[in-house]
């Protein structure tokens, strides 16, 4: 393979991260989230995904014989600002409000009364040998992959109670997601095509 263009996509990911081990771990463990993500800091073209390309991809998936439509969801993710070692950081716990009606209600009241949010803690995944399996980049294609451990938390968990404490006075980071989900017929692979509107990470609300 003398030309970068000859490299297969997955092979290119293997040059910049443990992509094959990431795939094996994701298949082996149900609580891991493996994602292919558009955009890569190592890719020379920094252009963002355009609305036109997004709609073209959606049309392809809508008419695909490999994937079938799985779901269409509206979610609002909320994380809070923390101070760690004197620096402002975003919490690794997030709450998600599901459905337009509940999202509208939250926006009116800024609390979770009569709502059914979910709580998840995310962290980078490391293998048993402590090898970092958290990310891999292509460098040739505008794509990267991440592997994270997702831990579902109960609303009475100590970490959640701390996360919610003094909620109305906390600075928050919001991400509204309109998600179109597609799944293979064998249910092994899923594509989430998601339009996202988010607040500025450097400016909390």
Tell me what each language-model feature is.
Residues 1-205:
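Phosphate-end processing signature that detects enzymes handling 5′-triphosphorylated RNA
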